[in-house]
């Protein structure tokens, strides 16, 4: 695997803001991937199950850009924003592709993207900390976004995980005497998605895992000692 990266950092607004930019490219030869094949135990022409196998095949080329900034908007408020873009292309997947090309040579996956990696990602977080007599009232609102991914090398629609955005909100009081209490709402807008997807085959082309926890509201408290 060969990879190259270049970065740039600077500050602005008289040091109140920081900006980071990173660009990278890579090529990965003989990537290790899992492929599923049908199994006929009784040799009767009926598929009884499928089995996974690990192969080193093809080449993956990728390039991407990541940018982030942090801004102290005033003495109480800080804003963080980030954005990422990833473009990938896989070739030489004949040994694991179940889609035939024009001559039946299994090249229907040529040019596929790395299916488990979203093309676009983004995040934002707003923190507000307002001092009080014996502590501070702290508020945090954050959002993270991913574009669609999944579908295996073949791009099966059954295996796609759609784009989604998750938001969290926290409001609490932190005492100067080392204790705090906080109310929170995680997955504020009750978004649903999956952590990931197994690219199977045969009668079960997709298997999702890790369902997103629904909107969760609660209160937490804690104490620490110096």
Predicted regions, residues:
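Transmembrane beta-barrel architecture of outer-membrane proteins
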Residues: 1-5, 60-68, 117-123, 164-168, ...
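C-terminal beta-signal and adjacent terminal beta-strands/loops
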Residues: 27, 34, 144-152, 173-226
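Flexible, surface-exposed loop regions and adjacent strand-edge segments
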Residues: 35-44, 50, 86, 92-105, ...
């Amino acid at each position: 695997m060969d990879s190259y990266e270049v970065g740039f950092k600077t500050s602005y607004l008289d040091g109140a803001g920081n900006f980071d930019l990173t660009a990278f490219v890579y090529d990965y030869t003989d990537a290790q991937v899992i492929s599923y094949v049908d199994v006929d135990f009784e040799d009767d022409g009926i598929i009884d199950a499928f089995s996974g196998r690990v192969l080193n095949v093809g080449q993956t080329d990728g390039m991407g850009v990541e940018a982030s900034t942090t801004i102290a908007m005033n003495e109480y408020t800080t804003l963080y924003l980030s954005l990422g873009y990833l473009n990938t292309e896989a070739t030489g997947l004949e040994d694991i592709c179940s889609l035939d090309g024009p001559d039946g040579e299994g090249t229907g996956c040529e040019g596929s993207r790395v299916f488990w990696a979203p093309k676009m990602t983004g995040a934002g977080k707003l923190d507000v900390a307002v001092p009080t007599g014996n502590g501070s009232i702290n508020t945090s609102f954050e959002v993270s976004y991913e574009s669609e991914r999944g579908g295996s090398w073949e791009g099966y629609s059954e295996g796609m995980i759609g784009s989604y955005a998750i938001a969290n909100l926290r409001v609490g009081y932190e005492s100067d005497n080392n204790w705090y209490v906080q109310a929170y709402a995680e997955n504020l807008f009750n978004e649903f998605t999956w952590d990931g997807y197994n690219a199977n085959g045969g009668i079960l082309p997709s298997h999702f895992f890790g369902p997103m926890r629904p909107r969760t509201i609660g209160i937490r408290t804690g104490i620490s000692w110096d």
